[in-house]
Amino acid sequence: MAIKKKKKETKSKDNNNDNLRNEKKSTNLENGKYDKKKVEIYEHGIGGITQNKNDNNKENAYDDDIYHDKSEHINVKYLNEKDYEIEKVSKRIYEENSKIKKISLHHKILKEELETKQLIEQNDKKKKNSLDYYKKVIIKLKNNINNMEEYTNNITNDINVLKAHIDDERNERIIYNNNMKILINEYNSLKKNIQDLNMQEKEQHKFNTKLKEELKELYKEKENMEKKHREDFKKLQQKIKEQKILSYENKINDLTKEKDKNKMENGEANKYEDKHNNNNIHNNNNIHNDNNICNDNNICNDNTIHNDNNICNDNNICNDNNICNDNNICNDNNIRNNNIISSNNKIHEKDNMINILNYYEDEKKKQLQNKIVMLKKLCLRILFINEYQIYNIKKLQENINNMNNAINSINLISYKKGDFDHIIINLNVSKEKNYSLISRINLLNYETNVLKQLIKKMKEKFKHLNLQNDEIINLKYDISNNMNEKMKHIKTSLLTNQETCNLKKKCFDDCLLYLKQLYTFIKNYENNNDKLNIKSQIINKDKNLHFNYIHKYNEDILVDENYINDFLIYIEKYIYSLNFYLPTQNFNYKKYLLHNGSIHNITLDTHASSKEYLQKEDSSEFNQHGHNLLRDSLNLNEQQENKDHLQHEEHTHEEEPKDANGDMVNIEDANGDMVNIEDANGDMVNIKDANGDMVNIKDTRGDIENIEDKSGDMENMKEPNGDMENMKEPNDDIQILKEPNDDIQILKEPNDDIQILKEPNDDIQILKEPNDDIQILKEPNDDIQILKEPNDDIQILKDPNDDIQILKEPNDDISTINNLTTHLSNENNLMTDLPKVDHKIKDEIQSEHILESTNISDDNINKENSLEIPLNYDHTQENILKNKNNMEDQNNLLEQNIMTDQLQNHKECEEFKPHDNKEKNNIINDDTKNLISDDTKNIISDDTKNIISNDTKKILSDDTKNIISDDTKNIINDDTKNISNDDIKNISNDDIKNIGNDNNKPYNEDHNIVTINDEKANYILNHFNSRNIEYDKLKEEIPNELLNIKYDSSKKSTISTN
C-alpha cells in the first residue's frame, strides 16, 4: 500500500510541473518576448544566415523592405519551433528524472519489506523449533492421512460393490448360457418331433393319395361295368329279335305251302280281287316285314291268275294272325327282357358288394398287422427306456459325487481368508452336470408322455375295431396292460428309486448342514457386533437382494429335495453375499483368535470361577468375534442317534489287539506295511492295506471312514438310514458346552474331561495323520515312553520306512485337509476348552482322578499328557494356517511342521509357568527339564538330523524356499508380522539352535507381541466397522442401475468365477 501511495504522489508532482511550464510559455508569447535585436543577435550567433540572405538582395530597395519584413516573420516562427523542441527535450529529461526517483523509492520500500520478512522468518524459525508447532503439524498430517484413508475406503467400497455386481452379472450370464443350452436342447428335440410329425403327415398324405387313386379306379370299374351291362343288354335284345324273325319265317313258309295247295284249287276265281288283294298284301308286307314283301312278290309271280282270290283270302287271314302273334310276341319279349335286365343288375350289384367287402377286409387286416408291428416296436422301445434309465442312474451317481465334491468345496469357506470363488467354480461344475441330470430326467418324462399319448391313440383306434373278434380284444387288453405296467415301472423308478433318493438326500443334507453353519456364523456375527450390522449394509433394503436368501429361511432352511437346481443357485448367491459382506482379506478372524495370546493365556484359580468364566465367555467375549458357529444347528434326535452309534462302535473296537497296558500294538502284515491300531482313548486306527493305501478310521466322535486311495479321493461312508452323520456328529462337543448342566457334569467327571480334551486334538490332527511324530503327541502311553525311555524313542524314530512312506504319498495330506472344514467350525468349543487346560494344570487332585480312571500306573505320565495334549492343539492349528495358501506343497512342509511342533511345545510350557503356583512350578520344572535335557535332545540331535538329511533334503531343497518366501509375504500382509517371523525363523534355521533360543526367551516379549497384535486386529475391526459410516456416501455415488437389481431364484438357474 505504501508503494502505491508514493507512486500517486510522484504522478501528481509531474502534472503540476507541466502546468507551470505551459503557463510560462503562454505569457512569453503575449508579452512579445522575441524582439528584432534579439533575433539579429541570435542570427549572428547561429552563423549569419539572415545577413547572407540580405546581402544577395540589395539592388532593389523596395524589394529589400519587403524581404526584411518577410524574414522577420519567418525567423520568429522558426525560433518558436526550436523553443518548442527544447521544451519537449526538457520534459523528457524531467520525466526520466521522475522515473529514476520512483525506482529509488521502490528500492527503499523493497528493502524495508525484506527486512520485515527476515524478522518474521527468524521468529517463525524459533516457533518451528518449539513442540507446539510440531504437535500442530502432526495433527494436520493425521487429519490429512485420515482424509486419505476415508477416500481410499470409499474407493475400496465402491470397488467391492462393483465387484459384487460384476460377479452377479457374470453369474447371470452363466445362468443365461446354461438356460440357453437347455432351450437349445429343447428346441432341437422339438425340431426332431416336428420333423417326425411332418414325416408322419407325409406318410398319411401318401396313404390318402393312394386311397383316392383306389377310389378313382373303383369308380372307373363301376363305369366300365355299367357300360358292359348296357352292351350286354343291347346284344340280348338283338338276339331276341333275330330269334323272333326266324320263328316268323318258319311260320310263313308253312303258310305258303298251305296257300299253294289252296291256290291250285281256287286259281282262276276272283282275279280282280286277287289284284286288289295283291296290292294290299304288298302294302302290308312293306309295313310289317321286308322279307314278307319279297316273298309275296315271288308268290305273285309264281301264282296263276286262278289262284289269286284264294291267295288273297289266305293272305288276309294270315296277315291278321301274324299281326296278333307279333303283338303277343313283342309283349312277351319285353317282359322277359325287363326281367333279365333286373336280374342281371342284381347279380352285378352283389358281385360289387362282395368285391368291396373283400377289399375292406383286406384293408382291416393290413391295418391290424401295422398296429401289431407298432405295438411290438413300442414294447421294444419301453425295454430300451428301462435300460437307458439304468444308464441314467449311473450318471446320477456320478453327478451326485460331483455334488459331494462341490459340498466339500463349501467346507473350505473358512479356510481361505473369506474368498469363496474357488467354491463357486466347483459348484458350477456340479451344476452343469446336474443340468445334464435334469435334462435326462426330462427326456424320460418326455418319453413317458409320448407313451401316454400313444396309449390314448391306441385306445381311440381300438374303439373303431370290430369287438366281436376275440383275437383283437385279447390283443388290445394285453398291449394296454403291458403299456400301463411299463409306465408304472418308469414312474416308480424315477420317483421311488432308493439309490437316487439316497444320493439326493446325501447332497441335500450336506448342503443344509453347511448352510446352517454359515447362517449361524453370520447371525452371531451380526447380533454380537453392535456397530457392524450387516443387514443395515444391504443396498436397497426394501427389495430382494443378497441377505434375503439368508434371513427368510431363519434357522430352518426350507428347501424341497426335488429342486436341487434352485438350491444350488441359493448356495451360490449365499456365498457371494458372504464374500461381499464378511470382513475383507486383511482381517482373518480365525488367525486373530489363534494368535491373540490374551485369550489363550487366561488363568483361573478356583473350580467355581472356571464355571463362571465358561458361562460368561461363552456368551460374551467369544461371541463378539462370531465364533459360536454351530449353536442351534442340530436336534436332540440327531444327538441320540449319534450316541447310539458311538456306543455300537466302541464295542466293536474293544476287540482290537492290545498289550497288557492297553498300549498301541504295531502289527506288520505280509507286505511289511505297518498297521497302527490304537487304544480306545486315542480314537484313531491307521491301517495300511496291501496296496500301501492308508485307511483312516475314526471311532468315538467322528463316525467317519475316510478311505483314501492313491489319487487322494475321499469316500464318506454313510449309515444305512441315509443321513450323513459325518458333519453332524462332531458337533456334540459344542452342545455339551452349550448347556450349563452339561458344563457342570464336564467339570465334575474327570473321565469326560479327558475325552473332551482329547477329541478336539484328534479332530485337527487328522491333518497330520501320516506323521508318526504327531501320532506320538496323541497317544498318551507313547508320549511317556518318548520322554522317559530313550531306547524305545530311538527305535521309534529310527524306523525309516514309516517316514519315507509318509513323505512319498503326496495326495494323502491334501485329501486329509479336506477333513479340516468339518472340524474348524468347532473353534469356539476349542477356545472355551483352553481355560480348562489351565485349570487342569493347576489341580493335581483332578489329575490323580484322571490317572485312576485311565488305569495307568505312572503319575508323572498323566501330568505330561495333561500339559502336552491340549497345548499341541493350538500350534497344530497355527501350522495349518501357515500352510493354507500352499495346499499343493504341504508334503514338502511335513518335516518342518514336525520340528516346529516339538519346539513350540517347550515354548508354551514356559508361557503357562508364570501363572502357576510355586509348588507346581517346581514340579513341572523338575519333570520337564530332566526329561527334555536327557531324552528329547538326544532324540532330536541324533535321529531327526539323519532322517532329514537322508530323506527330506532332496524334497526341501527348492520348494521350501519358495514356500517360506510366499508364507512370509502372505503372513506379513495379514497383520501377524511378529508371530509369523518367529515361526518362519524356526522353520528356516537349524532345529537345535531354535530349542535353545526359544527356551531362553522371556515371557514379556511374547506378551508384548500379543498386545501389538491386539491393537492391529482392533484397528482392522474398526476399519471394517467404518464401512457402516461411509455407507451413505457410497449410496449416493453408486448408480441407480446397479442398486435396482433384483435376485429371484425362480427366474435364474445358475455360478463362476475367477
From Swiss-Prot:
Q: How is it used?
A: Possible candidate for an effective malaria vaccine as determined by epitope response in sera.
| Annotated Basic and acidic residues bias | 11-34, 641-661
Tagged with keyword Repeat: yes
Annotated region Disordered: the residues are: 1-34, 641-665, 706-728
Would you indicate the residue range of the signal peptide?
Answer: none
Repeat as a keyword of this entry, yes or no, is yes
Q: Which domain of life is it from?
A: Eukaryota
**Coiled-coil regions listed in the entry:** 515-544, 872-905
**What keywords sit in the KW lines?**
Coiled coil, Merozoite, Repeat
Output compositional bias ranges, type Basic residues. 1-10
Q: What is this protein called?
A: Leucine-rich repeat and coiled-coil domain-containing protein PF3D7_0703800
Q: Which organism is it from?
A: Plasmodium falciparum (isolate 3D7)
Lineage runs: Eukaryota, Sar, Alveolata, Apicomplexa, Aconoidasida
